[in-house]
Amino acid sequence: MADMKKIATRVSYGNTLVELARQGADNLVVFDADLAAATKTEIFRKEFPDRHFDCGIAEQNMVGVAAGMSTLGYVPFVSSFAMFVAGRGFEQIRNSIGYPHLNVKIAATHAGLSVGEDGASHQCCEDLALMRSIPGMVILSPADDVEARAAVIAAYDYNGPVYLRFSRLATPVFHDPATYQFQIGKGEKLTDGYDIAVIATGLMVPEALRAAVLAKRQGIAIRVINMPTIKPIDEDIILTAAHEWRRIITVEEHSII
């Protein structure tokens, strides 16, 4: 995987917003909270400045404005760091988007521990638990550029609230864009193996693939399963793994409490 091209999924997010708008998604609007350079919505702003709204450091207000615009037929993508949009904006997401089941997409970048030098205050390891608790909320956690692009398109096409989780760091692009097909609610087997099953999501998927390579050198065959949808989760692929292997390891940048 060392030779693979690396792209941060937050960059994939910004690029795909532009592609959607170019292809006729005239109802797509993008919101940010003074972090457009980091969330990469600046890519969209440069080409469609009249459809990009910077709400300043006011995540709760941003969520409320986006909810209101969705009632007028727009499809808002709300963007900020996971800690800020899911943490600071939780009440508004719950009451203004989740409760009325509005068609708003929440794009959370810089999720998990891999935020690194941004520090502990920015390392969000609670967002998936918060978003899973909201009835009707779809949660997507893509692993590479190809999957992230497909997830953004799927989120736009889906009529309802979606939480998209993106990484700060660049990750290897291991999917083939010519053959990969994304479907909400479906996991994906990446490697064969009959000793251990590893179920990973997001940034941890390429780490699981690297671990599988190292384990193979020691005679251990790992089946790596990519779980790009956290909710609704692919129960079938999990139950199959439980029936076929005695050991299942889950890998995620998130608290398991």
Positions of the model-derived regions?
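Thiamine diphosphate
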Residues: 1-165, 167-257
